[in-house]
Amino acid sequence: MSTSASQSTWPAAGPVAEALLDVSTWLIAGASVIFVGVMVLLVLAVQGGPRAVRARLWVLGGGVLFPSVVLSVLFVYSERHQPPWRVAPPKDALIVGVTARMWWWEVRYRDPATGQEIVTANEVHIPTGRPVYFGLSSDDVIHSFWVPALGGKMDAVPGRVQHLQLQADRPGVWRGQCAEYCGAQHARMALHVVAHAPAEFDTWLAAQARPAAPARNGALDRGREAFLAHRCNACHTVRGVSEESRLGPDLTHVGSRLYLGAGTVPNDDARRVAWLSHIQQLKPGARMPSSAERLDPATLQAVADWLGSLQ
């Protein structure tokens, strides 16, 4: 599986992105030709010295006819190649709900076997080779969902559901970003799209539908008990352990995610401890207090280890 940490439109990873890239390429090529032409005329005008010209002919040709033809051609081309961003999904479509919040993403699926809602955060997993339909909304301010390698961006607006269609043609991991300024940590409101082969996606979705695995040993169980004792579950759901709140990201399978804090830091043992201890240094303004002043190092390590075990 290929991995890219960049937010580039090139190379395109799906048909929607390819259509946008084609239009952009033609626009850039056309603009380059016009720029070169203008520079050539400017040089000729400077070197040629004063001479009589038919001003009206230049105005009509260069100021009216030429831009009208260029804009008309580009308009027709772009309209014919406009990707189907807002196509109504068929009955058997994979629909992914994405709710933007300051400053993270809640992601929701439906288990095709049971109809159960499956909730995760900050990572969108999709199968390759088929369109995926996104329902985008926001719980606070206007955000914008954008994964450049897969397609165009779409605003997530409070009180509305916006629809976007994307598709990945090959397995891989692509970074996305909130593309609408939404507050202090806008720059750290990223997401990752993980595209699997269809069979692998079905396996992933089935695993996500299961509740959190029981603690495998006493040390992990101490982490689970500390998580509950210090009321982390007042904001975070861990299915099978506590389902009181969805104020913060669902942590049922947080150990399987690539990053913490909506792409802020990689999800490994050391950074999980650092995230719990000093979140306000890593993501100032996040709606979660740093825990270093409330919990001793051993307790922080136990909670971090337990969260890491939630695969």
Give the predicted meaning of each segment:
Residues 28, 38-41, 64, 77:
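Generic alpha-helix structural propensity
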